[in-house]
Amino acid sequence: MAGSFAQLAKNAEKKKPSISVSKEPVENPPLKVYQLGDEALRTPANRIVKVDDAIRKLAKDMLITMYSSKGIGLAAPQVGIQKRLLVIDLNFEDPNSPPMVFINPEIISSSATVDTYEEGCLSIPGVYLNVLRPSSIKLSYRDEMGRPKKMNADGLMARCIQHEIDHLNGVCFVDKVTDEEELKKQLNENNFKRSDVIKATN
């Protein structure tokens, strides 16, 4: 029996999240979130060659920063780091729901079905606009331990992943907004420049 309990304990340890972080906001987050107009948001990120403690530390700092801003997703370029890393937690108010870390994420396929939904961004505070995106996607990535993963995502998760991967490619969600009048209005109201928006080709 002792051996069985030891194995159960070992298995339980394996299931623990590799990155543990409180979801409570902190007064001084470890990272600065760059805003629309900064070149950091327009520079494509580089692939991560080695997943090590430094990458896990970055992911943890990104999560702390994200939670402190009450966001559900954050990409490394948003904090001025050009690495293909993003973190997501759709249940940021639930302390028992673990966040997800995506390293070198790539969309393998997208659905022909699309939908329109309002998006916001920690790098463009106060601006909320409709964006058309595929309803579901298939994704490949590595987790925080460097293990290769694949997943199917739909709904809000699919949208959030696409939004954050755009950041890895130097694209902001406002680049994909088609309602020009509302775009100009909200940018102006929140002290952003229309000239900082680059119309996306897809």
Swiss-Prot record:
Active-site feature positions: 164
Keyword Protein biosynthesis attributed: yes
Catalytic activity: N-terminal N-formyl-L-methionyl-[peptide] + H2O = N-terminal L-methionyl-[peptide] + formate
One Pfam match: Pep_deformylase
GO molecular function: metal ion binding; peptide deformylase activity
Alphabetized InterPro entries for the sequence: Peptide_deformylase, Peptide_deformylase_sf
Organism superkingdom: Bacteria
EC class: hydrolase
Keyword tags: Hydrolase, Iron, Metal-binding, Protein biosynthesis
UniProt GO BP: co-translational protein modification; translation
Amino acids binding Fe cation: 121, 163, 167
Note describing how the cofactor binds: Binds 1 Fe(2+) ion.
Region (Disordered): 1-24
EC number: 3.5.1.88
Keyword Metal-binding assigned: yes
Cofactors: Fe(2+)
Function in brief: Removes the formyl group from the N-terminal Met of newly synthesized proteins. Requires at least a dipeptide for an efficient rate of reaction. N-terminal L-methionine is a prerequisite for activity but the enzyme has broad specificity at other positions.
Family stated for the protein in its record: Belongs to the polypeptide deformylase family.
Name the record gives this protein: Peptide deformylase
